[in-house]
Amino acid sequence: MFNHIRLGIIGCGWLGTALGSKLVRQGAFVKGTRTQAEKAKELMAFGIEGYPFQLKEGSWIGDLTFFEHINVLLIAIPPGLSTDQTSNFVAKITPLISQLKKYKLEKIICTSSIYVYGQAQGKLNEDSQCHPNKLSGLQLIEVEQALINNFPDTIIILRLGGLIGPDRHPIHRLRMRSRIEAGLNPVNLIHQIDVLAGLEKVLLTQKKQHCYNLVSPYHPIKEDYYSQLAYQWEIPPLKFDQQTKYPKKISSNRFVSDYDFSFIVEKLLIE
């Protein structure tokens, strides 16, 4: 099914490695980058050609042969502001855009985040106004627009909900807090299984529009969701503030319609 795909993944981490290894098993040729040479070599265990490659502000360090013999590129790197508040994601992506103009790629896919919506409230879709209240959201919007402006015929941006899956779930961070704020807010999450299924749809389907949300349609309030999960996983009871803060339910109806997509993980691990 994927024999015609020659995919390059910039940022072959938790999500990129899962996608790459799955596609390799289905006949695709996959290259992936990691920032360290030793970590890049580890990708061979998944059938992925590993390349050391690191984006810097205004430049990069790495092996540019990564870009040869691929027809699709996935950019799956976070802004990095959680570990470095001075990081300029826009300045890192700008030289990458210049490099990509040298190649004829059928599709460029970029994972973004629902952080771009920030203080926006209510039921939101891709046409809703973004009101980012964090630097990461502001920089993601700039990067999205730069990619759309430079690659209008090939770019597809996926704004992902909060990621959950193998060895990854917000509850492990939230359980360390004495009290969790905005307990009455709806959750906007997505399981790795559904992200991979969505990316497969994008790879196999003709491009429709520039930007899509990819968030589970299951939106219980935080208190109900995390309390039930804590019970299932035998985590001590969590405490929540009985209030909302920029509550929102983010819709993926556009993606579901354009790509004939059905979510696989219906209740985000709730049994």
Map each language-model feature to its residues.
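C-terminal amphipathic/interface module of NAD(P)-dependent oxidoreductases
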Residues: E49, F53-E57, I235-E271
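Conserved beta-loop-beta element that borders a ligand/cofactor-binding pocket
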Residues: E142-P166
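Substrate-positioning beta->alpha
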Residues: L160-L163, H169-H172, I180-L203
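Mid/C-terminal beta-alpha module of Rossmann-like enzyme folds, strongest
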Residues: L196-S252
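NAD(P)H-binding glycine-rich loop region in Rossmannoid oxidoreductase-like domains
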Residues: M44, I48-P95, Q99
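Conserved Rossmann-fold NAD(P)-dependent oxidoreductase catalytic core, especially the SDR/UDP-sugar
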Residues: T94-N133
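Conserved N-terminal Rossmann-fold NAD(P)-binding element of oxidoreductases
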Residues: L7-G11
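N-terminal Rossmann-fold NAD(P) dinucleotide-binding loop
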Residues: G16-T17
